[in-house]
A protein has these predicted regions:
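Positively charged N-terminal leader segments that act as targeting/secretion signals
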Residues: 5-26, 37-50, 56-57
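Alpha/propeptide regions of enzymes that mature by internal proteolysis
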Residues: 81-406
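Classical Sec-dependent N-terminal signal peptides that target proteins to the secretory pathway
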Residues: 75-77
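Intrinsically disordered, low-complexity Ser/Thr/Pro-rich tracts
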Residues: 9, 79-80
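Hydrophobic core
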Residues: 71-72
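Sec-dependent signal peptide recognition
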Residues: 61-67
């Protein structure tokens, strides 16, 4: 129901009201139009402040001169049609990615280097993380930028990998100048892969040095069984006997000059789902290992505490954007990016996982923080899917491509 001056009640199913800026001689005007959809058709009506109807339901109202320029810019921006396209994750700003691995031992590392420094935030949701220099990313800490992020295997043993990365960066003159020495600021998080290949072989400083060198000289990022994804697996609620091989995956997009992408090392306790279709694509195997079953349903078989739950799990991600944000904003974006985990991994963020996400800013593009958080979750979900689809069987563990196709 709607009313107009000087008239009775008009039965209406919907009222459409629009206001838009229009350029005319002498400045900018508002064009206001109210269109009432009646049961027997439409009636356009518009009234100025004095209650006088405008021609064909259109009223022109003068806009103050001080607002003219801003409204013209707003009108131009809102008229643009933004299109989204997929881009390589390696094309976002000055971040360079290098990988090194030991294929036989099924372990490796992936290093993200930004010689100019990058602002970074971190959000940890899992109950068992293995990490280094995480407090550097706390918004309350003094350092505003870091120089590298390391994702590696080896669990806590692999945390020494960052020492090799620091050595390589120091040799290249990259780091924070303390006045007495150059100190590269390097954060790190690891997955547990000691149960996959050789438990005595772990990423070490030499491997970290090589990955950092490659990042600077010959970036070699690839999805699949490479770098930190070399020993990644999923679906381990029953231990390693019924799990599947996954790896490292990436996905990135560009929209209106904004670039955002994610690299994910997929090593979860739970199962993996296509976030768009809801179809399970990896995880716990059936007894004959020819099909998938639900980890969540399996866990619902008993309410008793599980003392021997397999704890060798953690999914790690680095979200990269060319938008300009500070550490506090990046911590929030990293938190929103965890929605991508929740859409794709079930269960997720368990006490037996060390799920963590870094978010880094390497540009000056102005962008809405919440929009970037939404996109971060989406590229994380797509990167998880790529980690499944690009994985190959290894050490006796089948990949998704090895399962019988329906």
């Amino acid at each position: 129901m709607t009313t107009k001056p000087g008239a009775g009640i008009i039965p209406a199913t919907r009222v459409i009201y629009s206001r838009f800026p229009v350029a005319r001689k002498g400045g900018l005007w508002y064009a206001e139009q109210q269109e009432t959809k009646l049961k027997n058709g439409r009636r356009r009506t518009c009234f100025d402040d004095a209650g006088t109807p405008g021609k064909d339901g259109l009223c022109m109202r003068r806009i103050p001169a001080l607002l003219t320029a801003a409204l013209l810019l707003l009108s131009t921006a809102s008229a643009e049609e933004l299109t989204m396209k997929e881009i390589p994750v390696t094309s976002i700003g000055p971040v360079r990615i290098g990988q090194a691995e030991n294929i036989e031992a099924a372990t490796g590392c992936t290093v993200f280097v930004c010689p100019e420094g990058m602002r970074a935030g971190l959000d940890v949701r899992g109950g068992g993380p293995a990490s280094r220099e995480s407090q550097l990313l706390n918004p309350l800490m003094a350092a505003q930028e870091i120089h590298a992020i390391v994702l590696a295997g080896g669990s806590a043993y692999g945390l020494g990998t960052a020492n090799g990365v620091m050595k390589c960066l120091e040799e290249r003159g990259i780091g924070y100048d303390t006045g007495f020495a150059l100190v590269p600021l390097v954060a790190q998080a690891d997955i547990y892969d000691l149960s996959v290949g050789s438990p005595s072989v772990r990423p070490d400083p030499d491997m970290g040095y090589e990955a950092a060198r490659r990042a600077l000289d010959e970036p070699n990022y690839r999805d699949g069984n490479y770098g930190a994804g070399c020993g990644a697996t999923v679906g381990k609620i029953k231990g390693m006997d019924y799990c599947m091989k996954t790896g490292i995956g990436s996905y990135a997009v560009e929209i209106g000059g904004l670039k955002i992408g994610a690299v994910v090392v997929l090593n979860a306790l739970g199962d993996v789902y296509d976030w768009r279709t809801g179809e399970q694509i990896a995880g716990l195997l059936t007894e004959d290992k020819t099909a998938l079953r639900s980890t969540s349903d399996y866990m619902k078989g008993s309410i008793l505490p599980t003392d021997n739950k397999f704890t060798g799990n953690t999914t790690l991600a680095v979200v990269i954007t060319n938008a300009s944000f500070d550490k506090a904003q990046l911590c929030k974006i990293a938190g929103m990016a965890h929605d991508g985990y929740a859409r794709s991994i079930r269960p997720v963020h368990t006490s037996a996982d060390g799920d963590s996400i870094y978010a880094v800013s390497v540009g000056d593009v102005p962008a809405d923080q919440d929009l970037v958080g939404i996109l971060a979750a989406e590229v994380v979900s797509e990167a998880i899917k790529q980690a499944v689809e690009n994985a190959e069987s290894a050490c006796g563990y089948p990949a998704a491509r090895d399962l019988p196709q329906e």
